[in-house]
Design a protein with these regions (language model features):
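N-terminal auxiliary segments of SAM/dcSAM-dependent transferases
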Residues: 2-54, 311, 322, 328-359, ...
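Conserved alpha-helix/loop element of class I SAM-dependent methyltransferases that forms part
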Residues: 51-90, 104, 108
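Class I SAM-dependent methyltransferase SAM/SAH-binding core
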Residues: 86-94, 98-156
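A short acidic, Gly/Pro-enriched loop at the edge of an enzyme's catalytic core
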Residues: 155-166
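Short, glycine-/aromatic-enriched active-site segment of Class I SAM-dependent methyltransferases
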Residues: 202-222
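C-terminal lobe and adjacent flexible extensions of AdoMet/dcAdoMet transferase-like proteins
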Residues: 238, 244-249, 255-377
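A short glycine-rich, Lys/Arg-flanked "PGG" loop and its adjoining helix->strand segment in the class I
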Residues: 180-195
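A short SAM/SAH-binding and catalytic strip from SAM-dependent methyltransferases
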Residues: 165-178
Length: 377
């Protein structure tokens, strides 16, 4: 089989023994320096890639006011990683930085849940740890801890396999030198039916090799970004058979110098959800199944947005593919739906499944769900 230049290197640590390992470590050192010393706040960023421009939902705004300002000002995320129905969950945040998302999620999981943050940058973790006791007083409970480590080496941390309900990450996976190892580690830690819900940066094509070694473009979350279709391939190879796009927005490279370097490359911030369910197929198949949302998820009494192509109205029986049926049936959302049908019959490919660029190219608000029944992907 003929190898495709650029595909493997963007997904996994490059082969080559000691030299490749040294190169990966050099990249990690540059990332540590960029986020530990070069940047002192989100105002120092030179693009919109690692700074979320999307509106925070009204229900979450009061929770952000309970997070310390020194934590908030060191936030470099590119999306929102707070999915529905989090009460009592055990959550892992990859590349947690100074801890904004950890402290936000800590309030959502409540005293009966736990949030663990992992980061390799000592300066960022120092900020997170400094205010851990302060946040426990604010919330009335202590349910947070932080670990120093690399997200490619999750097996080296004191984390029990199959012990997490949810893994999140916010504009960090693109900075990894071995994205395949990250996904493998996540799958190992998720319980059956658990979910990886993460926002990251993607490109409309493979980033040229010279740009992938540019320290500023890498630190700004651009040159480490995967071509979107390579990400889908990598996710499927890692056991996440059907990645679901939740929302996306185009990114603006407004710095003239960086814009000149990136040229025609188009970058997007996108949020995906990936479920750890063995029975998922590699395509959306039609088994004549349907679901009806009960309207019982807090904050979603009228409808529940599941991904970019699924918005479930309360009480409406909605035809779905076998994968969507399983994602709802085998996950924490099962109690909020009524399920119709099974897998005893097959009617072919579910209508609307395609393979074109999934992101919305026009600038503006983050792209939300399409009309119900418009297909799965």
């Amino acid at each position: 089989m003929t190898a495709v230049p650029g595909m493997a290197e963007q997904g996994a640590g490059a082969p080559g023994g000691g030299a490749a390992a040294a190169g990966d470590e050099a990249i990690r050192d540059r990332v540590r320096t960029y986020y530990g010393a070069t940047l002192s706040s989100s105002a120092d960023l030179r693009t919109s890639a690692c700074c979320d421009a999307t509106a925070v939902p009204a229900a979450l705004r009061p929770l952000l006011t309970r997070i310390h300002p020194q934590v908030l000002e060191r936030y470099y995320g590119c999306g929102l990683v707070a999915p529905e129905q989090l009460q009592g969950l055990r959550v892992l945040d990859l590349g947690c930085g100074a801890g904004r998302d950890v402290y936000l999620l800590a309030q959502l999981v409540g005293a009966g849940g736990e949030v663990v943050g992992v980061d390799m940058t000592e300066a960022q973790l120092a900020v997170a740890e400094t205010w851990r006791g302060w946040h426990a007083e604010q919330f009335g409970f202590a349910n947070v801890r932080f670990l120093r480590g690399e997200i490619e080496q999750l097996h080296a941390l004191d984390l029990e396999p199959g012990s997490f309900d949810l893994v999140v990450s916010n504009c960090v996976v693109n900075l990894s030198t071995d994205k395949a190892a990250v996904l493998a580690g996540v799958r190992r830690l998720l319980r059956p039916g658990g979910e990886l819900y993460f926002s990251d940066v993607y490109c409309d094509r493979r980033v040229p090799e010279p740009l992938r070694h540019d320290p500023v473009l890498y630190g700004e979350c651009l040159s480490g970004a995967l071509y979107w279709n390579d990400f889908l391939r990598l996710a499927r190879r890692s056991g996440f058979a059907d990645p679901r796009l939740v929302s996306d927005r185009p990114l603006a490279v407004t710095d003239p110098e960086l814009a000149a370097r990136t040229g025609a490359l188009r970058f997007f911030s996108a949020t995906y959800r990936l479920f750890n369910i063995e029975a998922l197929e590699d395509a959306c198949e039609d088994h004549g199944q349907a679901v009806a949302y009960r309207g019982t998820v807090p904050g979603a009494a009228e409808a529940l947005v599941f991904d970019k192509h699924h918005c479930f109205d309360t009480g409406r029986i909605t035809p779905v593919c076998g994968n969507t049926w399983l994602m709802l049936r085998e996950s924490r959302l099962a109690g909020h739906f009524d399920f119709h049908g099974d897998f005893s019959r097959h009617f072919g490919l579910f209508p609307g499944c395609g393979g074109s660029l999934p992101f919305s190219p026009a600038a503006g608000p983050a792209a939300g769900p399409a009309a119900a029944g418009s297909g799965c992907c």
